[in-house]
Amino acid sequence: MADSPFTSEQSGNFRGTLEYVPGKQVTLAHVIRNPRKSLCAAVGVDNPGALGIMTITPGEGSIIAADVATKAAAVNVEFVDRFTGCLMMTGEISAVETALTATVQALKEILGFFPAPLTHS
């Protein structure tokens, strides 16, 4: 491995660089059921029944996701960041689950995004 351009001649350790590679994917789709008031205060939302979080690449996809989510269920979009792809929504547990499921499905079927499974805590 000493001949590899990815190892250091002195230590033999792997050296690499992590780069952002654009792709179309939903990295995270998670529902926090009945979040504690301290968590809600930390992220700047009122105490909802549920908190839905998504991370989407490219980041502009979060705008589309927010549109789909609000049309799919009675949720409030609390935060959208088109640069990082973060989307945060609140609402009743069933509404947030419905919104996240519909959003992941729409991004997959309409735009060809690689989906993430819906997770819960």
Where are these regions (language model features)?
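Intrinsically disordered, low-complexity, basic-enriched segments
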Residues: 7-10, 29, 37-38
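Solvent-exposed alpha-helices and their adjacent loops that cap or buttress functional pockets
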Residues: 20-24, 43-47, 70, 78-81
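Structural motif
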Residues: 25-30, 50-53, 76-79, 84-88
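Short, conserved charged micro-motifs
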Residues: 39, 62-64, 94-99
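Short amphipathic alpha-helix segments
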Residues: 57-72
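Divalent-cation
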Residues: 11, 24-25
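C-terminal binding/interaction regions
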Residues: 2-18, 71-76, 80-121
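Short glycine-/aliphatic-rich beta-strand segments at the starts of folded cytosolic domains
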Residues: 30-31, 39-57
